[in-house]
Amino acid sequence: LIVDDSVVARSVLSRMVEGTRRFHVVAALGEARSALEYLRTNRVDIILLDIAMPGIDGLTALPDVVLAGQGAKVLIVSSSADEGAATTLQALALGAADTLVKPGVGAFGGRFAEVLEERLSKLFEPTGDGGCSARAQPPSPAAVRPRSPLAMLEPFQIVAIGASTGGIHALSQLLREIPASFQQAILVTQHLPPSFMHYFATQLAVLGGRPCEVATDRLRIRPGRIIIAPGEAHLRVVRTSEGAAIRLSTEWAKSGCMPSVDPMFESVAEVYASRAVGVVLSGMGRDGCEGAGRLIEAGAPVLAQDQATSVVWGMPGAVANAGRATAVLPPDEIGRLIGRGAAR
């Protein structure tokens, strides 16, 4: 589905998509409102969405488009989608899967068609269990009652957080509630294109009020720091003679995601056992569900974001429905709970 107010852009993008011979344009619409109406009765795999449009602009419509898409990936194609631009980061925070700078009218030549096909192909890569596929379905709501918060968190040394669509905003809310005195390490696996990871790290450092860096192989895990998985590798934790460290790997994960939350959770469970806390925030699919099970088996609590505050209650919903959530809470409450637990 193409959503762009420019007739020329819709025409050119349609030709390029059809020219891939792998993807087919089912509709090309000129405004976000029409797109929402179309998605009420039609299913698509990928949505190309412009930002600057009359009426409802793309950013304003994005959360509703993500929900109406029922698992469709949203690719922002806009002239204001420069990497690192505030608009781009906001789009990713609101649920876009990726962004692509749209050239000006009359400048659609060069490699743009090739880059567009590459982005579409990446968004539609097949996966093992639908975890990161374009048609992953959110689970049905589960009746999960949180246990008493203060009775839940025993002393811990590390927090591992997994998130995808809508997870950046949730992570921001969570980090704002963690006090500056918090000295436990925080690991984050967020589904984002590799090119955005350094901007993301800078953003988290400001929000979290503590150093944040993109993981490199054999990086030591130190107190009071945030480490995020790079976009092109899984983040795993290993024991070393000098303490815990990061190892990066690129093997296939069952979820099909790169990076995947499962390897992070599984390795954290192995190294830290009950001295860890797992968190699953808003995201499409089931990534993190298998790893959450390993954390629970090791005696570590797993906190899942609630459905009401999730852009997509896929990942946290899968954990809750599988009985692997110690508590289901809004992200700000998760942050306060973690902060209180560390202070005990």
Identify what each model region corresponds to:
Residues 1-2, 6-22, 28, 33-36, ...:
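Conserved acid/base catalytic micro-environments in cytosolic active-site loops
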